[in-house]
Amino acid sequence: MKQIAIMKNKIYRKIHYIFWHRLHPGRWSLYLFSSYRHYKLHGKKKNIEELPESIENLYLTQMPNPGAGIGHQMGNWNAGYWYAKLFGVEYAYSSFSDPSWDSFLGFGEGEISAEQLLKKGYKKRILPYFDEKSQKDVQLIREIIQSYGGKKIVFFTGLDQFYEKQFGVMEEIRNKFNNAKARKEEVSIYEKNCLNIAVHIRRGDIVIGQENQDPSLTKRWLTTEYYARILKDIVKELEKGYSYKIYLFSQGTEQDFPELKDIPNLVYCLDMPPRESFLHMVRADVLITSKSSFSYKPALLSDGIRICPANFWHGYPEGKEWILVDEENGLTEGQLSSLCEQVQQTKKKYGEMHEYN
């Protein structure tokens, strides 16, 4: 029975994706949502800021896509948290498909869940899809929410409602992660007496994408040469006086990465369990990400230096600790200089545990 339910869910998500994201139905599709029909019947109300008492029982959430990986699901979660803040209502927690990630991330600690609210008699209402960059769309969603003022409602955004920047909730999720109960049991293979550099190279499914030229997968591809060039440039600078180790998080075997065989102090962490890999990317002094939400999300939680591909579908915050690399040209002299300056600051963080000349 469980397998049948999983299959039905996959079929539903596929049809849902094709209808909303491939066919792009017009404005008429708004009437498919009861929340929009309610808004049309009850008309525009006062600004929600003028009626604070009316929004006390309004919540918003986004369900993590159960068919996606944890990086994608975190993107869904972040979107729900962000849109609740944007529209001035309370956030209702939605669990990840694997409960072990709930306890690992700790995002639900101190939050009331959508499931709890529905059991208390709150009504579920699904919001229409909207373009977050369209003021007209955002205002419409705001007015739909306002039309329910005074009622007990949990609003659900559409499946995979997009939120591009993601870093708008960076401080909140970092605080949640660092204060989660699971942090008390945190175990790391990193050495305290050297600079720890984590590299995530996405392979697995996108290798197949290279073979069949699936555009949804080829756009996620970065060659191993891209990483080798970055690492060689970094090593050249670090060998001037820093003790360091490089940890590679990916899938496969060492033989799958011949371009990296000459990189010194390289530790292969291939096929490490997902949560352990995720944690080590978060805790790295320097994190080199891929075109993958699985390393982008740890970058949002990290306090370290992040080196990221500039061409990515989620945004990056401004700041010297975010070094955005051109895929063709690699690190510039200015970026290498900035990296070295920031690495030097680790001396203040770790005292004399790093070996400096």
What residue ranges belong to the model's regions?
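Secretory-pathway luminal glycosyltransferase catalytic domains
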Residues: 11-20, 27-59, 99-242, 339-357
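Soluble, non-transmembrane catalytic domains of enzymes that act on hydrophobic metabolites at membranes
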Residues: 1-3
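Pan-eukaryotic secretory-pathway lumenal catalytic ectodomains of glycan-active enzymes
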Residues: 312-357
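Short, solvent-exposed loop/turn segments at secondary-structure junctions
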Residues: 67-68, 96-101, 159-162, 202-206, ...
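A structural signal for short, well-ordered beta-strand segments and their strand-loop junctions
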Residues: 60-61, 90-96, 198-200, 247-249, ...
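Donor-binding and catalytic core of enzymes assembling or modifying cell-surface/extracellular glycoconjugates
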Residues: 70, 235-310, 315-316, 321-325
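A short, glycine/small-residue-rich beta-strand->loop->alpha-helix junction that serves as a flexible
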Residues: 65-75
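Histidine-anchored nucleotide/phosphate-binding helix
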Residues: 74-86, 227-235
